[in-house]
Amino acid sequence: MIAGWFLGAEHGRLRSLISAIICASLCGCGFTLLMPVMSLNLEAMTGSAIVVGVNSAAAALSTIAIAPFVPRLLRRIPGRTLIIFSLLSAALTIPLFPLLPDPTIWFILRFAMGMAITAVFVSSETWINQIAPAGKRATILGLYATALAGGFGAGGLMLAVLGSTGWAPWIAGLCLFAGGTLPILLLRGPGIEQPDSESASFSAMIKAAGYAPAAIGAGLLFGATETTFFALFPVYGDRIGLPDHSIGYMMAAGALGGIAFQTPLGRLADKIGRMQITVFATAACALGPLLIYLSGANPVALYAVMFVYVGVATGLYTLGLAIIGERFEGGSMVTANAAFIMAYGVGSLAGPAISGVGMEIINPYGLLIVSSALALGYLLFLGLRKLQRRPA
């Protein structure tokens, strides 16, 4: 029976889904562990939130730089091969961080690591979107986001256990990225449907963004919210007086919120409508920073708010992917997903940089003001689009 599951053609689609989901969740776990470790080490090196924010922007710049080329890479290279190569490349950069403790060098290393991670996520998410049945797409993407958030939560817990100093967190991160190759190698099934030359072009990506602007906006806001959370909220926690272990639990609470919310949000999106749930999630993103401010340094209140805030905000990623899966098919999904990830990269670039400046001007609450303002901007965009579509 077990051999039949591993080898039987009837289970190939499920094996591919499982391998893509496990791979991405391990990658997410490594990301969530190392982002706060990098931020806390940079804070110790420089004492500047601006340096932390700008350095965190390296990963976003790499996403913007490589995302337009991923469809072309997937046109020439089988998806499984590209994912394995990217995971190993990311793993090999990790030991260089503690060996070369310099903010400028870390910027370069994070750029290289970010390119590899971007290729993994564009490939794996396209793979899931192509395989998922249309009627259950948001639910399956919710399950994927749940597994990804589980990886994020595990990364936060690992930070609480391992701390941010010494070699332990770096070695753990290396093992996580390298381990992501195992399900790709062991679980065989349908691969990624490769795009044709026209679908892989830059112009096709621009057209895809124009065809699904709500999805692109969701990626933009999620990129800003998520990366700011992992890059600067550890610094926020430090500046309001939380010890390292409480910061780790705060990060874990936010990531675990993603586990609790993604599948319900996916089911609601399949039943009620993706745009309605997107509006709800965006409103929660606008309100969340105010509740974080009101929580102060009370750990219990802060953990509870982070659980809901980050959990619902993560839903923007699920919803954006579901909208892409609804509007595109086959190889064209690669290009649309690349546009979505590129928008995520732009958000990841702008969010920490702007929030870092805000944090320096209004220490430390400028971070919360910027986070809320970005969500309100996207909520206004959704409202204007709805008014434009309403018949006169």
Tell what function each PLM region has.
Residues 104-112, 300-308:
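Paired small-residue
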Residues 111-146:
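Cytoplasmic helix-loop-helix junction between adjacent transmembrane helices
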Residues 119-132, 314-328:
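Intracellular juxtamembrane helix-capping segments at the cytosolic ends
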